[in-house]
A protein has these predicted regions:
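DNA major-groove recognition helix of helix-turn-helix/homeodomain DNA-binding modules
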Residues: 44-59
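Key DNA-contact positions within bacterial/archaeal DNA-binding proteins
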Residues: 18, 29, 58
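Recognition helix of helix-turn-helix/homeodomain-like DNA-binding domains
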Residues: 26-39
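Short, conserved catalytic or interaction motifs in soluble domains
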Residues: 36, 55, 65
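Short basic helix-loop element that most often maps to the first helix and adjoining turn
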Residues: 4-23
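Short, charged recognition helix plus adjacent turn
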Residues: 62-69
Length: 69
C-alpha cells in the first residue's frame, strides 16, 4: 500500500511526524512505520489521519498492483 501522508503533512504547514502523532494520539514511531509502508493503520486511525490532514482516506492511501494479489 502506498501512503501519501508525508506529502499531506507538508501541504498542511510542514507538520512534523511528532506533531501529527500528537494530533492523532499515536507514537511518532507509528507515523514513521505507516509512512514507510511497514504498518497498515486500522480503519479508525486511517479515518482520524484523513480528518486531521483535511483529506480523504483514499487520498492518503493507495493500493498498489502487488496489493491486489
Amino acid at each position: 500500500m502506498k501512503t501519501n501522508i508525508r506529502r499531506f503533512r507538508f501541504e498542511r504547514g510542514e507538520l512534523s511526524q511528532q506533531q501529527l502523532a500528537d494530533m492523532v494520539s499515536v507514537s511518532r514511531q507509528t507515523i514513521v512505520a505507516i509512512e514507510r509502508g511497514n504498518y497498515s493503520p486500522s480503519v479508525k486511525l486511517a479515518l482520524i489521519l484523513a480528518r486531521k490532514l483535511e483529506t480523504t482516506v483514499e487520498a492518503l492511501f493507495e493500493l498498489e498492483e502487488k496489493d491486489h494479489d
